[in-house]
Curated annotation (Swiss-Prot):
Name of the protein: Capsid protein
Gene Ontology biological process: microtubule-dependent intracellular transport of viral material towards nucleus; symbiont entry into host cell; viral penetration into host nucleus
Compositional bias ranges of the Basic residues kind: 215-234, 252-262
Keyword entries, A-Z: Capsid protein, Cytoplasmic inwards viral transport, DNA-binding, Host cytoplasm, Host-virus interaction, Microtubular inwards viral transport, Phosphoprotein, RNA-binding, T=4 icosahedral capsid protein, Viral penetration into host nucleus, Virion, Virus entry into host cell
Pfam short name (any one): Hepatitis_core
Location of the motif Bipartite nuclear localization signal: 215-233
Stored InterPro entries: Hepatitis_core (IPR002006), Viral_capsid_core_dom_sf_HBV (IPR036459)
């Protein structure tokens, strides 16, 4: 990957959360962009990675939504005097990345016990579900940003998306009174390029070759008796003189002047 594209991809993580579409809208837009490539069995880098994130987000999103629904339904059976587990006792996303998946439940259970050894079982399940759902949501946010990057690279081109992220970051980091009212859009950035490409497609005629061309004579000439004569002009009737003889005089000089000697 180009160094500028790599930097732009890293900057995607710093963009505001509300810049990106909601999960449902994002997946739908990504599928629309990927459908032509799926039909042609394309193996482009952006197609493969975007397809992976579409599948990942759909699975994670459904699982996370299920966790939230179960956790909410458990609230009715949790004793009303039970205090919620503080955030500091719940495993965070950064910690979960360092813990093997099979040990995640054990680590979270140990933290709940350290908070309150006799914590009610229903409240424990609720705490587990809330912790796992939070981890999934943060993973989904990262996957959502990456999916946005890859399917937009298919739609607009990697160079255009890189340019757009750079301009957007500059606009966001500029104090409000020194910047334009509206943030830059990728459509506005790519419109001049599309217009130029469209103009080239509709132009008629042959393309002029690069470099210098040999200068061509409009009228081809030849040399006759030391004089240059155009081939495009009418040729006179051949004169009866021999080759090398003097040229005939004009019609006005055909008759000799009378000789002074008779």
């Amino acid at each position: 990957m180009d160094i500028n594209a790599s930097r732009a991809l890293a900057n995607v993580y710093d963009l505001p959360d509300d810049f990106f579409p909601k999960i449902d809208d994002l997946v739908r837009d990504a599928k629309d962009a990927l459908e032509p490539y799926w039909k042609s069995d394309s193996i482009k880098k952006h197609v493969l990675i975007a397809t992976h994130f579409v599948d990942l987000i759909e699975d994670f999103w459904q699982t996370t939504q299920g966790m939230h629904e179960i956790a909410e339904s458990l609230r009715a059976v949790i004793p009303p005097t039970t205090a919620p587990v503080p955030t500091g006792y719940l495993i965070q996303h950064e910690e979960a990345e360092e813990i093997p998946l099979g040990d995640l439940f054990k680590h979270q259970e140990e933290r709940i016990v350290s908070f309150q050894p006799d914590y009610p079982i229903t409240a424990r399940i609720h705490a587990h579900l809330k912790a796992y759902a939070k981890i999934n949501e943060e993973s989904l946010d990262r996957a959502r940003r990456l999916l946005w990057w890859h399917y937009n690279c298919l739609l607009w081109g990697e160079a255009n998306v890189t340019n757009y992220i750079s301009r957007l970051r500059t606009w966001l980091s500029t104090p409000e009174k020194y910047r334009g009212r509206d943030a830059p859009t990728i459509e506005a950035i790519t419109r001049p390029i599309q217009a130029a490409q469209g103009g080239r497609k509709t132009s008629s005629g042959t393309r002029k070759p690069r470099g210098l061309e040999p200068r061509r004579r409009k009228v081809k000439t030849t040399v006759v008796y030391g004089r240059r004569r155009s081939k495009s002009r009418e040729r006179r009737a051949p004169s009866p003189q021999r080759a090398g003889s003097p040229l005939p005089r004009s019609s006005s000089s055909h008759h000799r002047s009378p000789s002074p000697r008779k």
